[in-house]
């Protein structure tokens, strides 16, 4: 018997909630690590998120609370269990497939307009739902949108609510107050201009971030990517300056006018104003029909897999590879470019 096998067999099993066996690490979230798990009773695969119970700023139980609030919404994973296991806070949820960042790379960093528009419709819907529940996400990026698996493989899910914040009291309907002394929360590449300026985030900022995600998929790269600087703070300032100095029409050049209309609309929203989600969805739905596309859930990666005779990508393997790639960098910062 080789040494590796002896090590594997001697390693104590981790059982979460008395029902789920931890198999292996498959990724990292904004806080903590994500593991592939399995139901001891049914053999069904699940995702298990774990963070140290001694973390300076524990987030997992807060995130579990948010998932409970969002339960029943289309495109949000179900929570199976959350609690404490020895030295860890744990959260057991539906296992999902690859992220849009994974799939963008799988498609050699090019999405057709049809794929972008099918995703846009679902992404706007996910944001509308969390806003309806009085929360803003504050970290909208391709890594936090995942496709489902099995019968949900064509459905888009929104995850990672560690940075989410309640923007309105659900009972009194009072909105949080306007402030201008906030640190940048989220990922600098997709952050709104107001977030860069230290203004308290609200619904408009999630929507603007989504606009940058759309243009990332349309262009393959955003003008403020790869900025060189001596410190992180200088880098964020350069990203902010480039973002503010790039006219929307320049950013959206080569894309249908609806994308610049979307971003101009989002940037014009007032702090407490509710976005007109239906107007925005209709903007892109009409474009979709004008281009004579069918909403058949055949994405670019669906076509690519058919051409290469591959089955559905194993979510655990894809996420594990993504995590290895990230570990090659010097750790994942909370705020990346």
UniProtKB/Swiss-Prot annotation:
Query: Where in the numbering of this chain does the Protein kinase domain appear?
Result: 20-288
Entry PTM: Phosphorylated. The dephosphorylated kinase is active in the cytoplasm while the active kinase in the nucleus is phosphorylated.
Note the superkingdom of the native organism: Eukaryota
UniProt EC number: 2.7.11.1
Q: Which cofactors is this protein said to need?
A: Mg(2+)
Q: Which reaction does it catalyse?
A: L-seryl-[protein] + ATP = O-phospho-L-seryl-[protein] + ADP + H(+); L-threonyl-[protein] + ATP = O-phospho-L-threonyl-[protein] + ADP + H(+)
One BP term from GO: negative regulation of smoothened signaling pathway
* Gene Ontology terms: cellular component: beta-catenin destruction complex; cytoplasm; cytosol; nucleus
Please give the InterPro entries that the UniProt record associates with this protein.
CK1_Ser-Thr_kinase, Kinase-like_dom_sf, Prot_kinase_dom, Protein_kinase_ATP_BS, Ser/Thr_kinase_AS
The protein's role, per its UniProt record:
Casein kinases are operationally defined by their preferential utilization of acidic proteins such as caseins as substrates. Can phosphorylate a large number of proteins. Negative regulator of wg signaling. Phosphorylates arm directly or indirectly and stimulates its degradation which prevents inappropriate wg signaling. Phosphorylates smo which promotes its accumulation at the cell surface and its signaling activity in response to hh.
Give the protein's recorded name. Answer: Casein kinase I isoform alpha
Q: What is the lineage of its organism?
A: Eukaryota, Metazoa, Ecdysozoa, Arthropoda, Hexapoda
